């Protein structure tokens, strides 16, 4: 249980600290990475949901 709590704290902490970068603009040479960069803050949430579904599949052992 402690591991799940620490994972949630890490995800929330990184999301709060990276919120200032949401409005940053990439240099012109890397403009084609914009869709990937926009999606990157969501990735920790997807890992959390994957862990939740996995635990539900094994009946929260």
Swiss-Prot record:
Location of the protein in the cell: Plastid, Chloroplast thylakoid membrane
Superkingdom of source: Eukaryota
Pro-peptide region(s): 1-24
Listed GO CC annotations: chloroplast thylakoid membrane; photosystem II reaction center
GO biological process: photosynthesis
Principal location: plastid
Keywords, alphabetical: Chloroplast, Membrane, Photosynthesis, Photosystem II, Plastid, Reaction center, Thylakoid, Transmembrane, Transmembrane helix
Transmembrane segments: 32-52
Function of the molecule: One of the components of the core complex of photosystem II (PSII). PSII is a light-driven water:plastoquinone oxidoreductase that uses light energy to abstract electrons from H(2)O, generating O(2) and a proton gradient subsequently used for ATP formation. It consists of a core antenna complex that captures photons, and an electron transfer chain that converts photonic excitation into a charge separation.
Subunit organization: PSII is composed of 1 copy each of membrane proteins PsbA, PsbB, PsbC, PsbD, PsbE, PsbF, PsbH, PsbI, PsbJ, PsbK, PsbL, PsbM, PsbT, PsbX, PsbY, PsbZ, Psb30/Ycf12, at least 3 peripheral proteins of the oxygen-evolving complex and a large number of cofactors. It forms dimeric complexes.
Family: Belongs to the PsbK family.
Name the record gives this protein: Photosystem II reaction center protein K
Originating organism: Drimys granadensis
């Amino acid at each position: 249980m402690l591991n799940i709590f620490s994972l949630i704290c890490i995800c929330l902490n990184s999301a709060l600290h990276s919120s200032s970068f949401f409005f940053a603009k990439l240099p012109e040479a890397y403009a084609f990475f914009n869709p990937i960069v926009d999606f990157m803050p969501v990735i920790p949430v997807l890992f959390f949901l994957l862990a939740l579904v996995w635990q539900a599949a094994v009946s929260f052992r």
